[in-house]
């Protein structure tokens, strides 16, 4: 890939528009990530689809396929006031101006949201949250259950509630 680009971070989230002429959108980083099959697309899947709209999640999933999509949390610590209309939302961070500043997502919740928003299976979301990120950064010894691979496992129920964690083969 030219210039070493292999991961589109925060895909379609706050990446802006490149406008040369009124009402005409130019090619930006999002289109480049979508167009190039080799580039992974990272997505933040919050409960309301604020970071990435559920329709866009489905489109990106269709474009990138099962092996070039990565779920991320974008988790950060902000404690600004919750704006009107967001009461009860627990996975978004707001700055002190009331603007979205990140998420309070854990990856299990991001997986659950992806399943809800797109119809992805539990197998799909595990791939997006484990196998694909491992491949993207060159960690070939993890991200899947196989002989000779590092035993980092998360035991969940059918709706992604974490029950147990095994790290480097040890129950945590």
For each of these PLM feature ranges, what is it?
Residues 12-13, 47-48, 76-77:
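Catalytic metal-binding/acid-base residues of hydrolase active sites
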Residues 1-27, 80-81:
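Histidine/acidic-residue-rich, glycine-tolerant segments that coordinate divalent metal ions
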Residues 25-44, 59-149, 153-156:
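His/Asp/Glu-enriched, well-ordered alpha-helical/loop segment
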């Amino acid at each position: 890939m030219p210039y070493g680009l292999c991961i589109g971070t925060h895909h379609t989230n706050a990446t802006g528009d490149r406008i040369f002429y009124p009402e005409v959108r130019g090619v930006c980083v999002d289109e480049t990530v979508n167009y190039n099959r080799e580039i992974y697309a990272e997505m933040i899947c919050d409960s309301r689809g604020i970071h990435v709209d559920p329709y866009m999640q489905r489109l990106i999933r269709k474009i990138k396929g099962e092996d070039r999509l990565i779920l991320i949390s974008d988790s950060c610590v902000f404690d600004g006031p919750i704006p009107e209309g967001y009461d009860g939302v627990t996975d978004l961070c707001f700055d002190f101006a009331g603007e979205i500043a990140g998420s309070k997502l854990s990856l299990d919740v991001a997986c659950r949201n992806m399943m809800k928003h797109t119809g992805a299976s539990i197998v799909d979301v595990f791939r997006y949250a484990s196998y694909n990120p491992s491949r993207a950064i060159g960690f070939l010894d993890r991200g899947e259950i196989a002989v000779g691979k590092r035993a980092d496992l998360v035991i969940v129920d059918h709706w992604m509630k974490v029950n147990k964690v095994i790290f480097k083969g040890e129950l945590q």
